A protein has these predicted regions:
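Canonical P-loop GTPase G-domain recognition
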Residues: 265, 271-328
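A short, Lys/Arg-rich alpha-helix, primarily the initiator
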Residues: 1-20, 56-60
């Protein structure tokens, strides 16, 4: 970061900063403009006072001009955001496609779009998980249609496992939510996880922000219930629902250990006809187990409710519980503190992804790095020493 940008970012005046490093404001102005280069002692003071944000390279090397950034038309950005706010599904879908893209020029465009987004604390973010066959899509569609009857706009982000060949979604939830997908007040988007368990977090969060900007009142995020994506989704929603089948035990359910512990609400689905009794038994078993564990979340005892998504039975009670849960979180301020934590998590996920992309695109192609890899292959260099050399190279050349 150049010194001028740092001072503006931190709200520090030239006069105040010049005083801190023991020089005149005139000298500092000359350093900032590039008219003069600071002496070594001054550069070290500047680096120390800025916690390394401004380093010697920022004085000796001019920053690279990002052509992708230069070509972005700010008027077109404003038009995109305006169209999203006015309810254009086409513009919304295009923006989410940009979010999912790995192309640098698309990511630069996304950054500019997001800078114009406003904070939205009115939307309710609902995570829904459960093993394949539990009826997640039917549940979301049935509840979503009921919410639309209440004049609410509903969106669904369905996290599909990705095809390793194409990187695209395998399941495609639009085919399983036929009524909801064609409703003018609904928006459904299958979202591929990118072939790795952690790939869901950043892209899904950013897609969710697009939906909030478009004015959707309720956003469902559906996951498979068999991997680490559940933890990532749990950390970006306001309430997390775990759907169960009318049968006993986590083992019989096929649920990954620990997912039940994430639940804010447990729903026994498919309480239809002959399975009504089994659903009630499962409900009582989990209620007893939760009572024994005695671990309330957000001041709530985790509730266990039953429903039939197919017959739209029990959904009103589930929605009532969600509203009470959200209102209580807002009253005790955990709703807003959680949203702040989610924002920080997004920031760190963005940092991790940027560094990973840097490593994958640049570091792995470098000739010096290839030599290190060959030495590791030939047992001439330890993994620890190779890691140290690569990290030093990355720090010197990329940061």
């Amino acid at each position: 970061m150049i010194l001028k940008e740092y001072l503006k970012f931190c709200g520090v005046t030239n006069k105040d900063f010049a005083k801190r490093i023991g020089i005149s404001p005139v000298s500092l102005s000359r350093y900032i403009s590039g008219e003069r280069l600071p002496e070594k002692e001054i550069i070290l003071k500047i680096s120390s006072l800025t916690d390394g944000a401004v380093n010697p390279d920022d004085f000796y090397f001019k920053p690279k001009i990002d052509n992708d950034n230069e070509n972005i038309n700010l008027n077109s950005i404003s038009e995109i955001v305006k169209n999203i706010r006015n309810g254009s599904k086409k513009e919304l879908a295009k923006t989410i496609t940009l979010v999912e893209s790995k192309l640098k020029k698309h990511q630069e465009l996304v950054k500019k779009i997001f800078e114009k987004f406003k904070t939205n604390n009115k939307t309710i973010r609902i995570g829904v998980t459960g093993v394949p066959g539990v009826g997640k899509s039917t549940f979301i569609e049935s509840l979503g249609l009921k919410l639309i009857q209440r004049n609410l706009k509903v969106a669904v982000l369905a996290i599909d496992p990705s095809s390793k060949e194409t990187g695209g979604s395998i399941l495609g939830d639009k085919t399983r939510m036929e009524k909801l997908s064609v409703h003018p007040k609904a928006f459904i988007r299958p979202s591929p996880s990118g072939g790795h368990l952690g790939g869901v977090a950043k892209k899904t969060y950013e897609s969710m922000l697009c939906l909030e900007e478009a004015g959707y009142d309720v956003i469902f995020i559906e996951t498979m219930g068999v991997g680490q994506a559940e933890t990532a989704v749990h950390d970006m929603v306001d309430i997390f629902l775990v759907l169960l089948l009318p049968s006993g035990g986590d083992e019989l359910q096929g649920i990954k250990k620990g997912i039940i512990e994430l639940a804010d609400l447990i729903v026994v689905n498919k309480a239809d006809n002959d399975l009504q009794k089994a659903a009630e038994i499962t409900q009582n078993e989990y209620k007893t187990a939760l009572h024994i564990s005695g671990k309330p979340k957000n001041g709530f005892e985790v509730e266990v409710l039953i429903c039939s998504s197919l017959k739209s039975k029990g959904l009103e009670k589930i929605w009532d519980y969600i509203q009470v849960f959200i209102n209580k979180k807002k009253k005790n301020h955990t709703f807003f503190s959680d949203r702040q934590s989610q924002l920080k998590e997004w920031m760190w996920n963005s940092i991790y992804q940027t560094v990973n992309e840097m490593i994958n695109s640049d570091l792995s192609k470098n000739e010096f790095i290839k030599k290190i890899q060959l030495k590791v292959d030939d047992k001439k260099l330890s993994v620890f020493r190779a890691t140290q050399l690569m990290c030093n190279f990355l720090l010197k050349n990329k940061f």
